[in-house]
């Protein structure tokens, strides 16, 4: 029920999963008007279950949170991951905040914020 990835990509995978946790909060997709799941990172492997293809589950548990935070800390965002985030933004208009602000993972998931939140999260009109 567990998986392991290459050490050089552990942080990348962790940030992708953490992004899915904050991005997918349930509700309806803005374009397709189809339901989206509420994806939640947890530390309890008993909650994590496989959902068959084509079956909608309103809540999806994934993790393990403590392992993902370890991977995130051990493998910080590099130039390739930042470039990918920029390219995704140029096409989709969304960014992974854990690549732009790695410190937010510990702040959000471990409640250990090392600095006050910034007055502006993203520049260049992204928040508009």
Indicate residue ranges for each PLM-predicted region.
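Ser/Thr-rich, Pro/Gly/Ala-heavy low-complexity intrinsically disordered linkers and tails
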Residues: 119-128
